[in-house]
């Protein structure tokens, strides 16, 4: 009997599949792309490194091509000119997020990253008010303090001179900073086992969350979809953030009681935290509790992982290109101001030195290009029929941004696989290595770009300038450091060992 029921479900699913996709596939039929298999489409061609397969399709079919992932008709864009036409010039059509079943089951797509319409507008506006350039400058002391704490840890490795991995140090560094912005929490410990454990959960979640979940594309497989480890790690993250939120609320209540005991006015001023603003919107009935927790998860993940990954990839690149490391050190040294006691500053602030250390900005851009944290953008969906570059794209089509291939385009970035920071020197057409800031899409394009990009730039600039000025990073082996990361929602850097020598 179960066999007959399974066959009946399969037949019904196939009928629904062909009915729903007939219109989309007809409209999208002129877009080039690979041959699709029945039911699976091109899903089985995507392995553990989807960006590599997307690159192969791009090389064969061009900047716009069509694939089908299970029952979902998909169009892939490559290159900033196409991104601009879609996500800037036609932003209302391309802005909505495609909401897969797995994401909807996880948080109802009520988080900052996954939501659409009024929910997304409310959450984005709220987060942006807490990470403006002025607020980042006011909060810069948090980054300075964390840089000082990190240097204390790294100084110990200078003394023993042994090779060691930097990855966990930078994850914890970024974790401490984002906790300050999210909750106003100060945590200076790099030996806290619970923090290391949650970092491990973040890494695992971002790895498994980046790989296709089959039931998102073939609904008949829904009974098996929770076997994916995405559903193991996301609840752990939500529980962790829930505890942090409860700690914040308890601390606020304690502060309120203390003020009452001391007959002080409880004016409930804005404490400058993101969670404070989220809770205010929640109590005003503008967002749900799910939005509060899941948006905290979004900010927590991005704050811990994206900036630390870019920093690690930068140090790998600077060790493998030692001439770039020395060039950067010399520029920092030559432009550094003396403190009142005549010594060099320990922490090099973004607000003070951003314009006087231009080579660091070039290095950061080249890392954003060559080691983009996002290789394949989170999916969008078209809200109506549209035409891009002569191709008709139907309403309901999933849209994917091919960031990896965009940044490796030889036409835009000659010698694209080489680390050449000088390619971003703004010299117009005379720069033989291409460049131009607008061709970088690592922070996204249009209304869905990264809300934390200013904070990320500030944090990465400050820690890199500080560390390169203070230490020389050395490869302990004769072979170049491995710079091939692992695919996920965020591109994860490999584990390498470094030797560091103190310069100051």
From Swiss-Prot:
Top-rank lineage group of the source organism: Eukaryota
PROSITE patterns, alphabetized: CYTOCHROME_P450
Cofactor: heme
Location(s), subcellular: Membrane
UniProt: heme binding residues: 450
EC numbers, comma separated: 1.14.-.-
One Gene Ontology cellular component annotation held by this UniProt entry: membrane
Gene3D superfamilies (UniProt xref): Cytochrome P450 (1.10.630.10)
Bilayer topology annotation: Single-pass membrane protein
UniProt cross-references to InterPro entries, sorted A to Z: Cyt_P450, Cyt_P450_CS, Cyt_P450_E_grp-I, Cyt_P450_sf
Segments passing through the bilayer: 1-21
GO molecular function, one term: monooxygenase activity
Record keywords: Heme, Iron, Membrane, Metal-binding, Monooxygenase, Oxidoreductase, Transmembrane, Transmembrane helix
Enzyme class, spelled out: oxidoreductase
Family, similarity comment: Belongs to the cytochrome P450 family.
Protein name: Probable cytochrome P450 513E1
Organism whose genome encodes this protein: Dictyostelium discoideum
Gene: cyp513E1
């Amino acid at each position: 009997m179960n066999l007959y029921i399974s066959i009946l479900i399969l037949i019904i699913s196939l009928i629904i599949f062909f009915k729903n996709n007939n219109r989309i596939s007809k409209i999208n039929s002129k877009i080039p792309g690979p041959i699709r298999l029945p039911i699976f489409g091109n899903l089985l061609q995507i392995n553990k490194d989807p960006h590599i397969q997307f690159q192969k399709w791009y090389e064969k079919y061009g900047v716009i091509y069509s694939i089908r992932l299970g029952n979902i008709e998909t169009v892939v864009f490559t290159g900033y000119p196409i991104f601009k036409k879609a996500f800037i010039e036609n932003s209302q059509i391309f802005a909505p997020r495609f909401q897969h079943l797995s994401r909807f089951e996880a948080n109802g797509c009520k988080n900052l990253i996954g939501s659409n319409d009024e929910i997304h507008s409310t959450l984005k506006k709220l987060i942006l008010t807490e990470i403006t350039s002025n607020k980042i400058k006011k909060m810069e002391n948090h980054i300075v303090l964390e840089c000082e704490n990190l240097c204390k840890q790294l100084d110990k490795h200078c003394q023993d001179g042994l090779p060691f991995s930097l990855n966990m140090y930078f994850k914890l560094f970024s974790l401490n900073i984002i906790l300050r912005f999210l909750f106003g929490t100060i945590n200076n410990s790099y030996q806290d086992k619970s923090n290391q454990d949650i970092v491990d959960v973040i890494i695992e979640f971002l790895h498994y969350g980046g790989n296709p979940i089959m039931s998102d594309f073939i609904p008949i497989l829904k009974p098996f979809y929770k076997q994916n480890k995405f559903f193991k790690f996301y609840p752990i993250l939500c529980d962790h953030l829930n505890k942090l939120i409860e700690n914040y609320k308890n601390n606020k209540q304690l502060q309120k009681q203390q003020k009452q005991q001391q007959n002080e006015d409880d004016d409930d001023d804005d404490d400058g935290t993101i969670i404070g603003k989220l809770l205010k919107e929640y109590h005003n009935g503008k967002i749900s509790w799910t939005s509060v927790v899941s948006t905290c998860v979004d900010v927590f993940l991005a704050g811990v992982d994206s900036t630390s990954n870019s920093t690690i990839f930068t140090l790998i690149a600077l060790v493998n290109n030692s001439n770039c490391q020395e060039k950067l050190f010399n520029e920092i040294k030559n432009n550094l101001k003396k403190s009142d006691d005549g010594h060099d500053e320990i922490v090099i602030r973004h607000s003070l030195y951003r314009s006087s250390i231009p080579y660091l900005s070039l290095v950061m851009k080249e890392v954003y290009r060559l080691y983009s944290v996002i290789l394949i953008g989170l999916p969008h969906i078209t809200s109506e029929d549209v035409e891009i570059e002569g191709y008709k794209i139907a309403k309901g089509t999933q849209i994917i941004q091919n960031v990896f291939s965009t940044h490796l385009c030889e036409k835009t970035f000659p010698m694209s696989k080489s680390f050449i920071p000088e390619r971003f020197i703004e010299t117009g057409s005379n720069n033989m290595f291409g460049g131009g800031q607008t061709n970088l899409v690592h922070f996204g394009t249009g209304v869905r770009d990264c809300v934390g990009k200013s904070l990320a730039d500030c944090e990465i600039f400050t820690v890199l300038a500080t560390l390169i000025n203070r230490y020389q990073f050395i490869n302990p082996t004769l072979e170049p450091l491995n710079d091939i990361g692992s695919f996920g929602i965020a591109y994860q850097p490999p584990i390498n060992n470094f030797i560091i020598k103190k310069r100051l």
